[in-house]
Each structure stands twice: as structure tokens, then as C-alpha cells.
Regions:
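Alpha-helical scaffold segments that flank or form the walls of functional sites
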Residues: 82-148, 172-185, 423-432
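His/Asp/Glu-enriched, well-ordered alpha-helical/loop segment
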Residues: 248-255, 301-372, 388
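Active-site gating loops and adjacent loop-to-helix segments of metal-dependent hydrolytic enzymes
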Residues: 80-112, 151-172, 227-257, 279-282, ...
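Active-site microenvironment of metallo-dependent hydrolases
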Residues: 2-35, 40-42, 46, 50, ...
Length: 433
């Protein structure tokens, strides 16, 4: 299922077909081709004969064209928390460094953090985020101005929601009103339901969130089996592991109806993998965050693949990664899977790139004059490997045919202003902390 594919009505530049000449293109499956290509606003690509009507012709001599990156688990506003609470395990980190300061959150702070997150995403080639954070409507309006795509899964756990009274049910009602609002949604934004986890949400909240998602055909988003402690505690309390427990509540929203995103899936049994596969759930691998917070393990990609589970990649939030660079996350995913399974054949460049770009309809270009991309060989056989494991600067980002970044400069926001605004806001946010 594709998410957030609406046309962007606030375009800063004309959208349409662009010709890019004398360039390299990474095709579906990971092969590299050189030539002249047409990038169409519907996300398709074709060879150019040179006589087509286009809105722009780009000299691609030092460019590599690829699909854009897709980030399937984020907390974008947590750019505000980047660099705080270092050296703490997950639960201590949440309870001492994150939850206490989030009580101070305001819509304005979330707007500033989200705008900074969008700037980082665009600059590193990501055009889609599946997000779970507070002030969901504000997040949507902010992201719409930048031109990126997103599915925003507002948290419905009243006790942890700074913008609603604990226990009031207002968070659930707010998300229902956002999803059912008949007026046009901002930009390329969709809404979903965020049920944080089995250790934060009680059975009633999990059931209500699932019921609302099913009633509205919306995406469900949850953290599952992120740490050994979470897995052990769930089994001790319910006699079931987290995904088994969720299935016993009829929690999952099947793929054809709206879908379910399960972030982390670190300590998951084969039975649980079969449950995920049966519901068509997206299991999101977040290797950097799992390692940084010493969660006790990361997802087993080979086992997930064997079970038929759809695996995606996510960075998690900027407070636990600390980056939103999904290209770097793709590298981390490949390396940790090889390391954990003692097998250098796992997640080669083609498979890794498929995980990082799965579902993308948009295009980005990378700077081939960047020394990190050299040598790539006259036949281009090293291009994809160099990109994943070495990296390069993002030159252009095209979303739905609209240019949101050109020649290394983002067009839909001013990065210098965004950075200064962020610095000023965190001074207030972390006052006396």
C-alpha cells in the first residue's frame, strides 16, 4: 500500500517531466544504466530521445539518479532532544531524559523541531516519513510547507500526551476528527493512529486505537519488542510475547485495509513472525537506535524474510539515533545483519537499497564529483556499493515532480534560519534541566 500520495498544492516550483542528460541511473533491482532519462511527475522514468516537452533539462554529467529514501519509523519533533540523555538504556532514558521534558512541549516547539527534521530529511534524500509524535495537526501543516510526504500517527495515550488532559479521551477523539475531516489535507500528508507500545498502552487503549484504525481505514503504528525487558515483562504479565499479545486483542490492521507498522521487532519469535506475515504488517528495522540504547538485540532480517514479513527501514527519533540520514541507516542495517549472522552475503547493496527505497515514487540525485563515490568504474558497477557504504552529497530532490532541492540547496525552507530557530527554542525547552 502507498501512503501520502496526494498532489502538493503549495509548490514552490513547477512540477512536471524533467530531462536529465548524460547521467547514471540506478534502476529497480539495483542495476546501473547511463544515458538520457525523463523523470515524470507520476514517479515513472523513461529513456529520452531528446525531443520531448519538458519543464527543465539538467546536465547529469556528475549526477547519480536514484529513488528517494523512505523512513518508516520517526519521531520528527524529537530533533529538540538530540544529544540529551546520552549513555542511558531505553527505559531510564525515557523516564529521566525524555518524558519529563516532553511535559513542557508546546505546538510551537514541535513546529520548530519538525521543520528542522524536514530540512535534514531533504538534505539527505528522504521524501517520506512514517511519524509518531505529538501535536499531529501542527506536524502535518509544517511538513506540508516543505513538500515531503508523511503518514502522521498521532499518539492516543492520554497519560503521555502533553497537549491533552490525562485520561480524557481527547487524544483519541482528536485523531478521529483529523482523519475524518472532509476538507483537503495539507500537502502530501496522511494521518494514522499511534499506540506507543504494550508497556505504555493498556488493553483498552490498544483496542480503541485498533478499532479506530479499522473504522477509518488508517495506518496503525506501534513499537514492538524493542528491548529484552519489554519482551520479558510482557510474557510475565500476559503469558504471551508482545506480538502474540497484540494478536490476541485482534489489534492488527491488515495491509489491504490500512496496514500496521511495527517498529523495531528485535526479540521476535518465529511464531510472531508468522503473525506479522499473516497480517501483511511492516516490520521496521532501526539498527542504530537499537545499538545506541543497548536494547539487547536487533531484528533478524534473514528470519523475517524467510517468514514472508515485509521489512522496511527507519531511523527512530533524533534523540536515540541521533540522525535522520536513512542512507547511513541502510549501511548500519547491512553491517549489523552480516555481523550478527556471521554471513557477509546478507543484505548486499541491491537488497539493502530496496529496503531503503521500498515504496518510493520520487527521485533524488547524488553528487558523483564527491570523492567518496570514486572510483565507480566505467561500467558503474561500484556505484550502488559506494553510495551505501561511503555516501555522497544530495544535489536534487524531486517529490511528485516538484523540485524541493536543486543543486545542493533546499528550496522549500531556509536551512540557516531553521538552524538558528532550533538553537533558540532548545534554550527555552531545556531551561533548568
Amino acid at each position: 500500500m502507498q501512503y501520502a500520495n496526494r498532489d502538493f498544492r503549495g509548490a514552490k516550483m513547477d512540477s512536471g517531466t524533467r530531462r536529465i542528460t548524460n547521467t547514471w541511473l540506478i534502476r529497480e533491482g539495483g542495476s546501473a544504466s547511463r544515458g538520457d532519462f525523463l523523470l515524470h511527475s507520476d514517479g515513472s522514468v523513461s529513456d529520452s530521445k531528446g525531443d520531448e516537452d519538458v519543464i527543465e533539462t539538467i546536465d547529469g554529467k556528475n549526477r547519480l539518479v536514484t529513488r528517494s529514501l523512505q523512513n518508516w519509523h520517526t519521531h520528527l519533533g524529537m530533533v529538540l532532544n538530540r544529544g540529551m540523555g546520552e549513555g542511558l538504556p531505553l527505559m531510564e532514558w525515557l523516564e529521566t531524559a525524555i518524558f519529563p521534558v516532553e511535559k513542557r512541549l508546546t505546538g510551537k516547539l514541535v513546529e520548530i523541531g519538525t521543520r528542522a527534521a524536514a530540512a535534514e530529511m531533504i538534505a539527505t534524500g528522504t521524501t517520506y516519513a512514517c511519524d509518531m509524535y505529538y501535536y499531529t495537526q501542527t506536524v502535518g501543516e509544517t511538513l506540508a510547507e516543505t513538500g515531503v510526504r508523511a503518514t502522521l500517527c498521532g499518539p492516543i495515550t492520554d497519560g503521555l500526551t502533553p497537549n491533552f488532559k490525562p485520561g480524557s479521551g481527547d487524544a483519541l477523539r482528536h485523531m478521529e476528527s483529523l482523519i475524518n475531516d472532509p476538507s483537503p489535507r495539507p500537502g502530501r500528508i496522511d494521518y494514522g493512529i499511534g499506540t506507543h507500545s504494550v508497556y505504555v498502552c493498556d488493553e483498552e487503549i490498544l483496542r480503541k486505537g485498533s478499532e479506530l484504525a479499522k473504522k477509518t481505514g488508517s495506518l496503525l503504528h506501534i513499537h514492538t519488542s524493542e528491548t529484552r525487558k519489554e519482551v520479558a515483562d510482557c510474557h510475565a504479565k500476559h503469558g504471551m510475547y508482545p506480538i502474540e499479545y497484540l494478536d490476541s486483542l485482534d489489534y492488527f490492521q491488515d495491509a489491504e485495509s490500512g496496514g500496521t507498522v511495527c517498529a523495531h521487532c528485535g526479540g521476535v519469535t518465529k511464531k510472531e513472525m508468522r503473525i506479522l506475515a499473516g497480517h501483511g504488517a511492516h516490520a521496521v528495522h532501526c539498527p542504530t537506535s537499537n545499538q545506541k540504547l543497548a536494547c539487547g538485540g536487533t531484528m533478524s532480517y534473514p528470519a523475517m524474510k524467510e517468514a514472508g514479513v515485509d521489512v522496511r527501514l527507519g531511523t527512530d527519533g533524533s534523540a536515540s539515533n541521533n540522525s535522520l540520514d536513512l542512507r547511513a541507516e541502510a549501511k548500519a542495517a547491512s553491517l549489523v545483519q552480516r555481523h550478527d549472522h556471521w554471513d557477509a552475503r546478507i543484505l548486499g547493496p541491491e537488497q539493502t537499497w530496496d529496503l531503503a527505497t521500498k515504496g518510493s515514487q520520487d527521485w533524488i540525485t547524488w553528487d558523483l564529483s564527491d570523492i567518496r563515490m570514486r572510483p565507480f568504474g566505467r561500467d558503474g558497477r561500484r556505484l550502488l556499493s559506494n553510495l551505501i557504504y561511503s555516501g555522497a552529497k544530495v544535489l536534487d530532490v524531486f517529490v511528485g515532480g516538484e523540485a524541493v532541492r536543486r543543486d545542493g540547496r533546499t528550496l522549500t525552507l531556509d536551512e540557516d534560519v531553521v538552524a538558528e530557530e532550533l538553537e533558540e527554542s532548545v534554550t527555552e525547552y531545556y531551561q533548568d534541566v
